[in-house]
Amino acid sequence: MQSLYNSKYAHIFKGPVAKHVTYKFHDLEVTYANIPHLDITVENITPDMIYKSAHLTCSSLFRMYGLSPETDGKLWVLLYRLFTVNEGSYDHRNTIGLELYINHLTAMYEELKVKSELLACVNFALGLGYFYMSYFVMYNHKKGNLLNYLHELCHVIHRYIDQIRLLHMRNPNNYKIEEFMRILRDVFKHYRISQFYDHVMYNHIFGLTRIVSNILCGCSSVCKEHYSIKDRDKSVRGIKTRVKPASAGQSPVLSIPVGFYVNQAISIKTRFPTTGPELFGQAENVIGILRSPVLYHVSQDDVAKIEMCLKTDFYMTEFYNNKEANNYIIPIQSPGCREQEEMMLKLFNNVVFCMYLACQVRQVILSQWKILLTLFRNQFLKIVSLMKGDSFIKICIERLADDIQHHRQSLGAVFKAFLTILPDVLKHVGFPVNDSNALRAHLLVEYLVDDKFAPEIPYDTYVRMARDYRLEILRGNRMPFPIFTLDLAETRNLIFSNEAFHAFYNVISYDDIIPNYSSF
């Protein structure tokens, strides 16, 4: 309020400067120093607004205490956007990933450790736990979330494979399609939907790409050697045949360079002062370990567009747009063969490309997952080292850190146990930390000022976003924070139960995405 008084909006104050100005809303109270009284009516705050204010701060909602109003607002709006469902249009510029979130947590840590390093570590651990809940568990329908992207990729691959099988059933006498299916049948029948991101299956499909393209198309841009159907059969039986080299191809071939994807939007290279920088020395370049797909009959313009989309957000935007429009994920030109073979080749090329994307995205997920686990464990050990004396709580936290390291229980169970002992941990901080009432009252004062004067206040991007979101929630124009997602009661909690959550929301499980997830 002091900055508001010193700005061009000084007219919203009335009377002389007072040493202390206090505003009360039932049991909520906030005091400002060295400003006049505001020209507002406290009675305009309803009981419903007071109730909603409990969901508008990190201190009251997540028990992250000691934060300045600006830092509290930044972390609150990041978690709000992570927890709420994003079913609208996807924009990679608005995506909140691990790097962005951890940078804000690190800034909070640096700001708060001057007051209490123990409290800063506790808040950091809480922030990691809530990120895990919102990003690694409740990812369904959240565009821009890597797990949701992988989930959608697997379903698209499954749909294309179903279309391949249906096309085969409709053309029982087509020799080329029959030969194509004979090659792929052994691959498809041994894998399930949650394994389309597995590098073993991708390498199996990759090895068949040129063979399949030769069978279905056989044009000069595909064939480096001309094989007749009879010669191919002889080659399979080990009979050598003399072949002629093909002429140069007319249509361009898309071949994504190995290691092409270095994406700022999903990269995990960032700075982590005092939180374990040794983790990130070799963590960034996890992409490029797979052989890149070679796809035929893609125009030069489409090649440039695909490469641009891969650089921007690893094809997320284009993928979601094509999926919603029911188009192919990548456009394939007509190869000039029969209609049935052409459709089969387009489907196969899209399967290969989507599997490539899925395998690469999984590598990023695995790297981020390992980083999250290590950061969690490091924070627990740091909390133990900062707590003075010997106590039962220190032993409990040491056990939780040990459980993470040796995979004795899931990260969700560890976080749930940490929340249970959190009140006892906060007793070691050494000063009262529950300042949520003052922050809630401050938000209500901001609402009254904005409702009457609507001042344009220059803020940091996320501080302004938090202010706008909070005011819209108080006015009833925005969905409140989904409190049910934070309910850790055994009777209602689905998010910490792998089988229950994935069965209820019909999404793929972590069993293969993250190795030993059940034991994490």
Curated annotation (Swiss-Prot):
- What family is this protein classified in? Belongs to the herpesviridae U4 family.
Write the protein's name: Protein U4
The record lists the organism as Elephantid herpesvirus 1 (isolate Asian elephant/Berlin/Kiba/1998) (EIHV-1)
